[in-house]
């Protein structure tokens, strides 16, 4: 998760080491990782699979990559991505709701 990643990055920084973030094969999670990468002083690179079309689940659209291969952090609300709820529903195998009292 984000908290654990930040702890690892800060530990690496305390030893003068870089902490590079790898891809997740789900571009919505990669968008979260992109935000985390930008919050880490000792992160210089962001690994991302291309072509992206095979790794779009569960997000609508692709991450903004320019002609130099640089990804820009979206400035939309939240993490900047939109979930594809129709795709999620088509791939859901069950629904379970738990009522908490």
Where are these regions (language model features)?
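Shared catalytic-loop signature of beta/alpha-barrel
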Residues: 1-70
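C-terminal extensions of enzymes
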Residues: 53-101
